[in-house]
Structures are given as C-alpha cells and as structure tokens.
C-alpha cells in the first residue's frame, strides 16, 4: 500500500507540474485551447485574412516554437534560440505547403499590407534613441559612421584574400560578394545594386540579382550565428562587452539625464504617438522633400534615426515621456518579437534560395567576409570609444545581414534589441554608402 500511495503521489505531482507548465506565460490547458482553435481553423480552412486572423496565427505558432527554440540545446546557444527557430519553422511551413493560402494571406496582410514590421522598427527606434543620454547620443552618432566604414574595409580585405584563394578576381569578389553582403539587405541593397549594375555596365540586372541574393542569404545565416557567438564571448570576456550598451562611458564622459517620475499608461501612449509621427515625417522627407542626396537615396528609417535623435537633443521630451517610449519599446521587443518572427519567416525567408546557394565556395567566402566585417567594426569601434562586441554586432553584422528583418534576427540572437537604432543606421545609411561605392566599382569594370 505504501508503494502504491507513493506512486499515486508521484503521478499527481507529475500531472500537476504538467498543468502548471506555461507556454508564452499561459498555463498548458489555456494554450491548448488556443492551439486547438487554430487547428480547427486550419482543418476547415476558415481564417479571416485580416489583423485578427493574422495575429492569432502568429501568436499561437510563435509561442510554441519559441519555447522549443529557447530550450533546445546547442541551438539556443549557437544558432540564435527562439527567434531563429520561429522564422525557420515558419519558412519551412511555407516551403512544405503546410500553411494554407488563406493562412499565408493572413500573415502577409499583417506584415506587408498593414506593415507591422515598420511599426515594430519605428517603436524600437524611438524607445532606443529617447532612452539614451542626449549628449552621449550625439557623440556616439558622430563616431558610428567611421565604425561602419571600418567594417566595410574589413569585409573587403578579408573577401579579397579568400577570393584570391579560390581563384576569383578582385573585381568579381567586390561586385558579387562584398557589395551585396554589406549593401543593406534585399530591397535597399541587392535590388538597387542590380539596377546600378545594369545602368553602369549594361549587363543583365536579373543575372546579377540572382547571384547577389543567394550570397546575401548565406551571409545572413552566418550573421545570426556569429551574433549568438559574440554574445557568448561577451559574457566570458566582460571587458569586451557593454552588455547591450555601445558606448564606453569612460571615453564619452557626460552628465546623467534627469530621472523620470511616475510613468502612467498615458506616457506609454505618447511613445506610440512619437513613434508614428516621427516615422511619418521621415517618410515625407525620404519620399518628397529629400528623396536623394548627391544621387543617393536615403531610406526613411535612416531619416527617422536622425529625427528622433534631434527630438532627444531638443529637450522637448520630458523624462517621463522618454521613459514611456522606452516602456513601449520594451513591450514590443519582449512580447511581440516571437509574433514578428513568424511573419519574417513567411514573408521574407525563401528556403529554396538558401538551398540553391549552398555551394562550398559560396559558404566559405560569405563566412569570411562576415568575419572581416566583425573584425573591422570591432577594431574601428574600439579606437573610437565603443565596446568591441556591440560595435561588431551593429556596424559589422547588421551591415552584413539582409536589412530590417535581418537586424531583428541578429539582435534577437544576441539579446541586444535595444541597439536597433544603430542597426538601422547600418542597414540604411550604411547601405547608402555601399551604393555609392558600388557605383564607383561598377564604373571601373566598364
């Protein structure tokens, strides 16, 4: 009887632990209700293709695969953990035909038609920049562009060396490998690069783009992996890392900002107002007022970084409003990131492109170029007054990934979402710098 009683108690304890297990903060029975609802919707192919249907699908799917990615050994340390697991599984669901067309449409409407990605990035930029000491922000922005240039130089040198080892000429390495990888992603990088290539050389833009996007896809994977590795290095060698802070304050001495008082929901709502209005102003500037400078188009997120920085420097925002914007930014980055990554996997990740690009030479060359970007940005950042880990992530890896969605993948892999403003400078302003370099390189080939 004693043994039976103990066995019964053990079974009850096991059942109790299972019922208390939480997925995305929800007890297992409650999550099971949400999952069963989603499966019914999938079985009957009945899902509204609007924000409600899209968010329901993205929340439920992101929750389960986020928990798996967070707990999976090796993957959670070296590959990027939950966010990377989510977008890879979501991309596979599209590739394998598991998602119905209605489900793809629902997610696409959230990401593309409603452009949730723009809102997500706008909120993170506003919160990240307004939370930084005003004087420190201005000094760091002035030093950041040279750090980006150091990353480009590092990527070019490493790329040329490894290219020569494979018997590839210098001009071809720069044209087909270094520039696409460091060019700011797909829409702001590979696409305009192919147009510049066509207009300068007269050759096929399609031929250039197909090669460029394949190389960029491989580099983006390495950027995510290296981000996770850099996070581990920073934890072991703490003097190399600012734990999410880019600037070494010993190098940029400033007075502390005034402390915020009590923060209410209203200040958080004001953070949303500032995020959307600053984005709107940046969009107007980029599309109508100053669509290009010296023939180079500047992306609206690059303008937004400058606008929010100017707003911070102006002193118009009280400490409470700044804290409200930071609270909103934290909510998006901590509670909605898994949701967003489902959309990234469905809308911005093509597994077939990744598979097609996996040749030995392409993999090795792309990896070495990304390493060069990391080394160059780390050295340049250290000399200017930044932490090497953070400068190599933002000015190195966020130059070598695939733009806005790549920034989120890289920063989530190394747990540094608060660096999104610098990542956007890399993807947008840095990408513009690469387009200027491309115009020169391509013209030398004619």
Curated annotation (Swiss-Prot):
Cellular component annotations (GO), alphabetically ordered: plasma membrane
Catalysed reactions, as listed in the record: citrate(out) + 2 Na(+)(out) = citrate(in) + 2 Na(+)(in)
GO molecular-function terms, A-Z: metal ion binding; organic anion transmembrane transporter activity; symporter activity
Positions annotated to bind Na(+): 181, 183, 399, 401
Localisation: Cell inner membrane
Residues passing through the membrane, by range: 23-43, 46-66, 79-99, 110-130, 148-168, 213-233, 267-287, 289-309, 335-355, 364-384, 425-445
Lipid bilayer topology: Multi-pass membrane protein
InterPro entries noted in UniProt: 2-OHcarbox_trans_Prot/Firm, 2-OHcarboxylate_transport
Binding, citrate: 186-187, 402, 404-405, 428
Keyword Transmembrane helix applies: yes
Domain of life assignment: Bacteria
Pfam assignment, any one: 2HCT
UniProt GO BP: citrate metabolic process; sodium ion transport
Keywords (A to Z) from UniProt: Cell inner membrane, Cell membrane, Citrate utilization, Ion transport, Membrane, Metal-binding, Sodium, Sodium transport, Symport, Transmembrane, Transmembrane helix, Transport
Stated family: Belongs to the 2-hydroxycarboxylate transporter (2-HCT) (TC 2.A.24) family.
Subunit and partners: Homodimer.
Function: Secondary active transporter that catalyzes the uptake of citrate across the membrane with the concomitant uptake of sodium. Is specific for citrate.
Protein name: Citrate/sodium symporter
This protein's encoding gene: citS
């Amino acid at each position: 009887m004693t043994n039976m009683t103990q066995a019964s108690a053990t079974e009850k304890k096991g059942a109790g632990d299972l019922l208390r297990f939480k997925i995305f903060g929800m007890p297992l029975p409650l999550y099971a209700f949400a999952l069963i609802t989603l499966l019914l919707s999938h079985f009957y192919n009945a899902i509204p293709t609007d924000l409600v249907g899209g968010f329901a699908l993205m929340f439920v799917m992101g929750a389960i695969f986020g928990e798996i990615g967070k707990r999976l050994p090796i993957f959670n340390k070296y590959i990027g953990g939950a966010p990377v697991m989510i977008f890879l599984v979501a991309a596979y669901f599209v590739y394998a035909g598991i998602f119905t067309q209605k489900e793809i449409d629902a997610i696409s409407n959230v990401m593309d038609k409603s452009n949730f990605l723009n809102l997500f990035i706008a909120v993170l930029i506003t919160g990240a920049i307004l939370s930084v000491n005003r004087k420190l922000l201005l000094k760091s922005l002035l030093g950041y562009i040279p750090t980006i240039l150091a990353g480009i130089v590092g990527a070019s040198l490493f790329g040329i060396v490894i290219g020569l080892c494979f018997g590839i000429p210098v001009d071809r390495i720069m044209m087909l490998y270094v520039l696409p990888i460091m060019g700011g992603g797909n829409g702001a990088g590979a696409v305009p690069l192919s147009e510049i290539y066509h207009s300068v050389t007269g050759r096929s833009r399609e031929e250039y783009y197909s090669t460029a996007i394949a190389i960029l896809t491989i580099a983006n994977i390495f950027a995510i992996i290296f981000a996770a590795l850099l996070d581990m290095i920073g934890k072991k060698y703490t003097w190399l890392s600012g734990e999410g802070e880019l600037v070494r304050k010993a190098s940029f001495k400033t007075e502390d900002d005034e402390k915020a008082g009590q923060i209410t929901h209203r200040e958080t709502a004001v953070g949303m107002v500032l995020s959307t209005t600053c984005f709107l102003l940046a969009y107007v500037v980029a599309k109508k007022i100053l669509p290009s400078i010296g023939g180079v188009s500047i992306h609206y997120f690059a303008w937004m970084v400058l606008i929010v920085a100017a707003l911070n420097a102006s002193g118009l925002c009280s400490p409470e409003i700044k804290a409200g914007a930071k609270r909103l930014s934290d909510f998006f980055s901590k509670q909605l990131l898994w949701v967003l990554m489902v959309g990234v996997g469905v809308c911005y990740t093509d597994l077939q492109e990744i598979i097609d690009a996996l040749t030995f030479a392409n993999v090795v060359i792309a990896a070495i170029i990304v390493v060069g970007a990391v080394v160059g940005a780390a050295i340049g950042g250290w000399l200017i007054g930044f932490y090497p880990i953070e400068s190599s992530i933002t000015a190195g890896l966020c130059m070598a990934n695939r733009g806005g969605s790549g920034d989120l993948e890289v920063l989530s892999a190394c747990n540094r979402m608060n660096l999104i403003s610098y990542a956007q400078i890399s993807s947008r302003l840095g990408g513009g710098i690469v387009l200027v370099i491309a115009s020169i390189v391509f013209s030398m080939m004619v």
